[in-house]
Amino acid sequence: MKIFTNQEMKNYSNMRVGGKAKKLIILEPKEEIIDVYNDKENTDIFILGNGTNILFTDEYMDKIFVCTKKLNKIEDLGKNLVKVETGANLKDLTDFMKDKNYTGIESLFGIPGSIGGLVYMNGGAFGTEIFDKIVSIEVFDENHQIREIKKEDLKVAYRKTEIQDKNWLVLSATFKFDNGFDAARVKEIKELRESKHPLDKPSLGSTFKNPEGDFAARLISECGLKGTIIGNAQIAEKHPNFVLNLGNATFKDIIDILTLVKKSVLEKFGIKLEEEIIIVR
């Protein structure tokens, strides 16, 4: 493992916001996680993947950040089973599926997170969720043991999994794919994302979860908040469920945007929006 102190955590978040951290540990291989938790000096541990949905405070964080981005192996187990380590990203998995002529999660193409992060929150897009093709996951559990859990033994819902409640670390996921890679679907999703999502400035993607039967972006738009700027943070014109860093946004700028959105939507629609991003203070 590699250990760093006083790292600028803005370099580990797609939002490019964040103060310094007490310690950053980069795992490789996965078994090193046992040593991390057995070290009594390591308290207040936070697991970090690719940082695509993490907003860090600007202040010093007295935490131990454990980064899994080097755990990125993708292995074909045969019989259409593929084991993917937590730090692998969807681009690499999609390329692997194309090479093997596998199909099943093409609609997720373009989501910038790690597999571990997507599994943790049951990430999804365009009618597909990551758990649709998962048969089992490998976790580091609350007893500091590495174990495999079958999908049917897990509680999974919209942007929610039992993993969050039990604070497990996802180490890998095993998928069962079908045959017949859908290149046309990948192309369609790529074009949809480019047309609907603001990809030219730092952001964390979808900021709020969609309430049941509705869309956060629609609610925010109906509140007249498209394009709203606070400090150096902006509610995107192109997709109002995205918050953009215009260059030098602070943690407070972004929190003030989130507060404004939640207050406005609650007052106009009586709906309490819930963040899809993770905020680390």
Curated annotation (Swiss-Prot):
Tell me any Pfam family this protein matches.
MurB_C
Which residue ranges run through the membrane? none
Active site: residue positions: 159, 206 (proton donor), 276
Write out the annotated subcellular location: Cytoplasm
Give the GO biological process terms: cell division; cell wall organization; peptidoglycan biosynthetic process; regulation of cell shape
Query: Reaction catalysed?
Result: UDP-N-acetyl-alpha-D-muramate + NADP(+) = UDP-N-acetyl-3-O-(1-carboxyvinyl)-alpha-D-glucosamine + NADPH + H(+)
- Chief subcellular location equals cytoplasm
Keyword Transcription regulation recorded: no
Which key words are in the record?
A: Cell cycle, Cell division, Cell shape, Cell wall biogenesis/degradation, Cytoplasm, FAD, Flavoprotein, NADP, Oxidoreductase, Peptidoglycan synthesis
Q: Name one GO cellular component term.
A: cytosol
Please verify whether the record's keywords include Cell cycle.
yes
Reported cofactor(s): FAD
The pathway is: Cell wall biogenesis; peptidoglycan biosynthesis
PROSITE patterns from the UniProt entry? FAD_PCMH
E.C. number? 1.3.1.98
Query: Which GO molecular function terms does the record list?
Result: FAD binding; flavin adenine dinucleotide binding; UDP-N-acetylmuramate dehydrogenase activity
All copies of the FAD-binding PCMH-type domain together span 17-180
What family is this protein classified in? Belongs to the MurB family.
Name the NCBIfam families on file: murB (TIGR00179), PRK13905.1 (NF010480)
Which HAMAP family does the entry link to? MurB (MF_00037)
Cited function: Cell wall formation.
Q: What is this protein called?
A: UDP-N-acetylenolpyruvoylglucosamine reductase
